[in-house]
């Protein structure tokens, strides 16, 4: 019996990042974690900054960082339209730590015209990148 898979396309403003058959997709939607497999009900959801874990048709996994976007699930395909997509190997850990620290420092020293929402978004994005890297490191250690 053939594995039950779904076509997944991950696209950013810069172009296509991933296209292929997958047996499972895990992503963080606006209402929490979503697991998408063959036969999932149609769905449209906002995506929070975080990780997309893709289990390919051959059983191997690939992990991506998504800065946010939209997930669309249809009977024959699933699409992620993301603001920014990075393969886990392309995440700069040092830059993510610096961005998080910089945003946190700005919040402490903020004046009345400071944009707290923008700082919180930057912290969330940097933290999500660091979580993706942490997940990859844990998987390698196994």
Curated annotation (Swiss-Prot):
Pfam families: ATP-synt_DE, ATP-synt_DE_N. InterPro entries: ATP_F1_dsu/esu_C_sf, ATP_synth_F1_dsu/esu, ATP_synth_F1_dsu/esu_N, ATP_synth_F1_esu_C, ATPsynth_dsu/esu_N. Keywords: ATP synthesis, Cell inner membrane, Cell membrane, CF(1), Hydrogen ion transport, Ion transport, Membrane, Transport. CDD domains: F1-ATPase_delta (cd12152). It is found in: Cell inner membrane. The keyword Zinc-finger does not apply. GO terms for molecular function: ATP binding; proton-transporting ATP synthase activity, rotational mechanism. GO terms for cellular component: plasma membrane; proton-transporting ATP synthase complex. It is a peripheral membrane protein. The keyword Transport applies. It comes from the Bacteria. Gene3D superfamilies: ATP synthase delta/epsilon subunit, C-terminal domain (1.20.5.440), F0F1 ATP synthase delta/epsilon subunit, N-terminal (2.60.15.10). F-type ATPases have 2 components, CF(1) - the catalytic core - and CF(0) - the membrane proton channel. CF(1) has five subunits: alpha(3), beta(3), gamma(1), delta(1), epsilon(1). CF(0) has three main subunits: a, b and c. Belongs to the ATPase epsilon chain family. NCBIfam families: ATP_synt_epsi, PRK00571.1-4. HAMAP family: ATP_synth_epsil_bac (MF_00530). Produces ATP from ADP in the presence of a proton gradient across the membrane. PANTHER family: ATP SYNTHASE DELTA/EPSILON CHAIN, ATP SYNTHASE EPSILON CHAIN, CHLOROPLASTIC. This is ATP synthase epsilon chain. It comes from Shewanella denitrificans (strain OS217 / ATCC BAA-1090 / DSM 15013).
